[in-house]
Amino acid sequence: IFKKMYDNGDIYKGAYKGMYCTPCESFWTESQLVDGKCPDCGREVHYAEEEAYFFRLSKYAKPVQELLESGEFLEPASRVNEMINNFIKPGLEDLCVSRTSFKWGIPVDFDPGHVVYVWVDALFNYCTAMGYLNDRYDDFDKYWPAVHHIVGKEIVRFHSIIWPAMLMSMGLPLPNKVYGHGWLVIDGGKMSKSKGNVVDPYKLADMFGVDALRFFLLRTFPFGSD
């Protein structure tokens, strides 16, 4: 997949300089930081620089914008507004899609000093797990495109901007719809396993039953809101 996008001119080699969030494995520009911290997780960032391959995300800015503005691809509307105002209108920057600072991961076959960054291999897992470009399974044509992607709001950008652009690059059909849901919060902050502030759903299910818990969650929380 990486080689195909490279061969069609959508991946090129360059150098990345920017503010890096280690837990999120994401680079950010100064303008994207919130109070000098990662806009996704709120943790500290640090300056980093490395040779890398980039995906020409900027090339797909117009078709992605048209996709979002259609009102048919992403819900709720508040997420559409966030994507357009926070990312599309300021201008999409080309996306860093390889790393040299660690060795674990899928190596770039034509440049083994680089490993493929998680947002390429993780997103395309939707396709490769069903047999796309491999002979382990043969379900891709049966099940793709996906009917729905249901994702947390912190990864809406990856599923509604980056993912469609990469699928366009590969000439593959897009998912029919992406839904970006809000967070469950406690004491004003996001519930997070890494922060250790999660209410154990298994205990609630044991106490009240699985169906009662599902009904409570669906009935109580407006979709898309925290």
Residue ranges and their predicted role:
Residues 14-27, 180:
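Short, glycine/charge-rich beta-strand/loop segments that flank catalytic centers
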Residues 17, 34-35:
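Short metal-coordination and nucleic-acid-contact micro-motifs, chiefly zinc-binding Cys/His arrays
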Residues 23, 41, 47-226:
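Structured secondary-structure scaffolds
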Residues 1-11, 25:
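N-terminal Rossmann-like or analogous alpha/beta NTP/dinucleotide-binding catalytic cores
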Residues 35-36, 50:
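Predominantly a Rossmann-like dinucleotide-binding segment in NAD(P)-dependent oxidoreductases
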Residues 28, 45:
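Cys/His-rich microdomains that often coordinate metals
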Residues 29-34, 110:
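Short linker/helix segments within small regulatory modules
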Residues 4, 20, 37, 95:
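The −1 position to Zn-ligating cysteines in a subset of zinc-ribbon hairpins
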